[in-house]
């Protein structure tokens, strides 16, 4: 084999290996990608059904119902509400009226079943996505009240 052909074969093999590696990385990234939605976006049908995503907002006052390890509550962004159920131990900082981000799936009836629940960790912190969703919902609420 001539040196030029050998070099071309090595370059072609390297490019093929690089392409396969890039495909595998992107495929793994896509399967682990979890999007964030506010209750308003979920209510509008923007969230996927039967696919994992995160929902964030505030735990609505008076909606937490406990039954052993199963907890049902409502997440709100002050404009819309989504019922959530979770089986497991909640974080110590989980409280009504406080910020929460839950990861799970939405069923056909609009009920969110969480596999993980995260609570804010001090009085000044709220996840950026949840803060932005609450601010957007408040703006929409203000605009509607002005009309």
UniProtKB/Swiss-Prot annotation:
GO terms for biological process: cytochrome complex assembly. The chain crosses the membrane at residues 8-28. Residues 1-7 are cytoplasmic. One of its GO terms (molecular function) is heme binding. It is found in: Cell inner membrane. Signal peptide: none annotated. It is a single-pass type II membrane protein. One of its GO terms (cellular component) is plasma membrane. Residues 29-147 are periplasmic. Belongs to the CcmE/CycJ family. This is Cytochrome c-type biogenesis protein CcmE. The gene is ccmE.
């Amino acid at each position: 084999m001539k040196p030029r052909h050998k070099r071309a074969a090595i370059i072609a093999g390297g490019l093929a290996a690089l392409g396969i590696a890039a495909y595998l990385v992107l495929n793994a990234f896509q399967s682990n990608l979890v999007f964030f939605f506010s209750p308003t976006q979920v209510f509008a049908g923007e969230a996927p059904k039967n696919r994992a995503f995160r929902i964030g907002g505030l735990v609505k006052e008076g909606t937490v119902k406990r039954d052993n390890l199963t907890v049902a509550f409502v997440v709100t962004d002050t404009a819309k509400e989504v019922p959530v159920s979770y089986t497991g131990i909640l974080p110590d900082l989980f409280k009504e009226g406080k910020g929460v981000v839950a990861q799970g799936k939405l069923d056909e009836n609009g009920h969110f079943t969480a596999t993980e629940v995260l609570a804010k960790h001090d009085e000044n912190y709220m996840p950026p996505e949840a803060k932005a969703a609450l601010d957007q919902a408040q703006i929409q609420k203000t605009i509607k009240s002005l009309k």
